[in-house]
C-alpha cells in the first residue's frame, strides 16, 4: 500500500525506471560479427518458417525506428531528461519526506490522545 499522496511520485519513478531500462536495451551493441550461425536446415513444415518471416518483416521496422529515435538516445537528450527529472521530482524530496513524517507523527499523537481517557491523560500537552 502506498502512502497518501505518493501515487504520483511512484508513477514517475516507475516511468523513469522504464525509460532507463529502454535506454540500456537500445544502447547495447550487438556481439562480434565474426561468429555467424550455421544456415537453418530445410523446414519440414510451413510453421517452422514463421520465426524467419517475422524477423524478416520486423528488422527493417526496428532499424527505421532506431534511426529515427537516435537523437533521443544521445547523451545530450538523456542528460537533459535526467536533469529535468531531478529538478521536478528529487530536488525537494528531503523536505517533502520530513514534512510527511512530522504530519504523520502529529496525526498519530492526536489519535492516541483522543483515544486516551481523560482520567489517565489529563490535560498535558503532547510534544
UniProtKB/Swiss-Prot annotation:
Q: Which GO terms describe its cellular component?
A: high-density lipoprotein particle; very-low-density lipoprotein particle
Question: Might you name a Gene Ontology BP term for this protein?
Answer: positive regulation of triglyceride storage
Keyword vocabulary terms for this entry: Lipid transport, Secreted, Signal, Transport
- UniProt cross-references to InterPro entries, sorted A to Z: APOC4
Question: Transport as a keyword?
Answer: yes
- Primary location: secreted
Please verify whether the record's keywords include Transmembrane helix.
no
Signal sequence, start to end: 1-27
- Pfam hit, one: APOC4
| Compartments (UniProt record) | Secreted
Function, as annotated? May participate in lipoprotein metabolism.
The family assignment reads: Belongs to the apolipoprotein C4 family.
Protein name per the record: Apolipoprotein C-IV
What lineage does the source organism belong to? Eukaryota, Metazoa, Chordata, Craniata, Vertebrata
Amino acid at each position: 500500500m502506498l502512502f497518501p499522496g505518493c501515487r504520483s511520485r511512484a508513477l514517475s519513478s516507475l516511468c523513469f525506471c522504464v525509460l532507463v531500462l529502454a535506454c540500456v536495451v537500445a544502447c547495447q551493441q550487438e556481439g562480434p560479427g565474426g561468429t555467424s550461425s550455421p544456415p537453418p536446415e530445410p523446414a519440414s513444415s510451413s510453421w517452422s518458417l514463421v520465426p524467419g518471416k517475422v524477423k524478416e518483416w520486423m528488422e527493417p521496422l526496428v532499424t527505421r525506428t532506431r534511426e529515427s529515435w537516435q537523437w533521443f538516445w544521445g547523451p545530450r537528450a538523456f542528460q537533459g531528461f535526467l536533469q529535468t527529472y531531478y529538478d521536478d521530482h528529487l530536488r525537494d524530496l528531503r523536505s517533502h519526506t520530513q514534512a510527511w513524517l512530522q504530519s504523520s507523527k502529529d496525526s498519530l499523537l492526536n489519535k492516541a490522545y483522543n483515544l486516551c481517557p481523560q482520567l489517565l491523560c489529563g490535560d498535558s500537552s503532547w510534544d
